[in-house]
Curated annotation (Swiss-Prot):
Biased composition (Pro residues): 206-216, 355-372
Coiled-coil spans in chain: none
Bias (Basic residues): 404-415
Family: Belongs to the NUT family.
This protein's encoding gene: NUTM2D
Biased composition (Basic and acidic residues): 465-479
Organism: Homo sapiens
Region of interest called Disordered, as start-end residue ranges on this chain: 201-252, 345-494, 555-685, 703-806
InterPro entries: NUT (IPR024310), NUT_N (IPR024309)
UniProt-recorded name of the protein: NUT family member 2D
Amino acid sequence: MFQEPVYFQIFLFQLDSGASGEPGHSLGLTLGFSHCGNCQTAVVSAQPEGMASNGAYPALGPGVTANPGTSLSVFTALPFTTPAPGPAHGPLLVTAGAPPGGPLVLSNFPSTPLVTEQDGCGPSGAGASNVFVQMRTEVGPVKAAQAQTLVLTQTPLVWQAPGALCGGVVCPPPLLLAAAPVVPVMAAQVVGGTQACEGGWSQGLPLPPPPPPAAQLPPIVSQGNAGPWPQGAHGEGSLASSQAKAPPDDSCNPRSVYENFRLWQHYKPLARRHLPQSPDTEALSCFLIPVLRSLARRKPTMTLEEGLWRAMREWQHTSNFDRMIFYEMAEKFLEFEAEEEMQIQKSQWMKGPQCLPPPATPRLEPRGPPAPEVVKQPVYLPSKAGPKAPTACLPPPRPQRPVTKARRPPPRPHRRAETKARLPPPRPQRPAETKVPEEIPPEVVQEYVDIMEELLGPSLGATGEPEKQREEGEVKQPQEEDWTPPDPGLLSYTDKLCSQKDFVTKVEAVIHPQFLEELLSPDPQMDFLALSQELEQEEGLTLAQLVEKRLLPLKEKQHARAAPSRGTARLDSSSSKFAAGQGAERDVPDPQQGVGMETCPPQTTARDSQGRGRAHTGMARSKDSVVLLGCQDSPGLRAARPTSPPQDHRPTCPGVGTKDALDLPGGSPVRESHGLAQGSSEEEELPSLAFLLGSQHKLLPWWLPQSPVPASGLLSPEKWGPQGTHQSPSAERRGLNLAPSPANKAKKRPLFGSLSPAEKTPHPGPGLRVSGEQSLTWGLGGPSQSQKRKGDPLVSRKEKKQRCSQ
């Protein structure tokens, strides 16, 4: 019936320890085939080693059939015992013939009691073993024309008690067991291909050379579901077909980076379904890899939905610190994905110029490449298992990449990869943009200058003219040009305020009076220190107290100016010696008296009775100027000191010595009293002398009259002005019997330390009298009214006429 016999070589690599058969005996494995009609029958039995060596074949058991359409067949039971301790035996080789027409797979066969012990009870333990079946199809004489190898991985076995019949009450019919699928590899000898996974059980067996790396990858084909174990062992099965589960024999081998990367690409749609629009999608996909793998090993019958639900619950209870490792893993996977796309783009660009023009077009085209071209891509990925990837694994995830990339936000590594692909076109434009701001064009500068001129106005707009003027030394003109008129609205508001009497009064009350005096003087010298101290004292005063303090001195000054000032002149005993010539009484000169003089600068102003100041000059260079040098003090001529110091005093000419004082006509200012005697005809003839300004040059000496001045004729300053001037009418010398008022006495103050009677002084001419309006700060003693009036430019002409008439 068989046209071409098929031979199988079965190698037993591992035998479980635990239960053993009869002592000194080990079991061998026998495989036989028979053909009956359209069915194939195969029997696998275990026999003692002696029987196997003799080549005895077991009889075919009843009901041991195999359907031709079965694609995944496994051993239901493979009972055997471990050989006794002793020298290691080689693998058992059994050759059987099989018809070539049927499929080269094994089907289920009943669990007949193949090995029994003496007590008639088989062991209940289970073990795992690997069986390699090598098939050869021979025509005529036996020769290795076509060689095929099947790798069968046996799951835990079930031994049954003797006497149990298939389908009986004692032993129920066995069910299919979950095992690794059959991986056919054409034209390759893969005997011993699972040595690395199972720990390398070589044991010196005569095995063929190791297979290529592609055969060492775990199977990708999903396994079928199976029922529960009849003896209450652990359940088996798997999750949904889209979930990859590690087979039991590959648990010791860690997943490669490349496989985890592919699983991560498969799990991204699942993670996005549970976390839509979330940045944690990639990290959750990495988290699903170990969690779903553990759930599949613990409970293979668990569905995919249940596994995802458990994984999501575990993810929610995971802390952020524990999630960091998954974020890092997701970042690496994104880099792998971007690098893979870059390599695909490069491979497409190398084919021809049709994909080069736009950078965005090549990114969309490589998503559908043929399968043989993608095999080269794992070489560029930085993973250990990249070259081991089969060609059938890469195409499936490609249709999902555009979907996942379109939904998730582009992470940083991905953006870097995209920018690398887009960098070449814009590079020539960037340097041009950076070079533009290095040099400012003159048009922009001119426009900026025009705008600033419009904003600042025409005064600063013509910047060239003021700069030239400053270079030439003209500084005042730019200052005048820089002045801008104030706001007309502000001016109108100020005028409105000034028109109110109450406002002006309040402002005048607040302004410091000393500041007003300094401001109205021609040469103001403000004492900021004294002013600041006084203002600090006034800070603690209220408004009413401040107004009262400001108005009170003003009222006193007004009353003092209005009251007439009459009285005899008094001089301080500590003042310098003075001598006053009065008419022809002083004609005898005194040769013992020396004459010396120094000039004093004029720095004063005065006011007349109406408050108007008048400056008088021309007295400095007069030949008849009075120069006096006092030598001795006369006890008869002393002036009483004033009872109270003046309110305002400012000396303008320093003293020459302790007892000698030098005064020049015009050398010190003179202020006229507001209340002179109205009955004096001489005073009516004299104009209102405000003050006399002297020259800085030395004046010629002249002799004083010899006649002494009576004690009643001593002069005393009546009033001191704000600029240090005083007034002395000298009424008794003119024949006036007017006594000074008490108010005026209170304001008197001596000019010098002491006074001395005037010695005999020569008189240049008769008819000269001393005016009561003249100052005694420089010891004026002999000149007459005309002599004093000679310093006044208004009476200089009258003086000349009188001299000419004489």
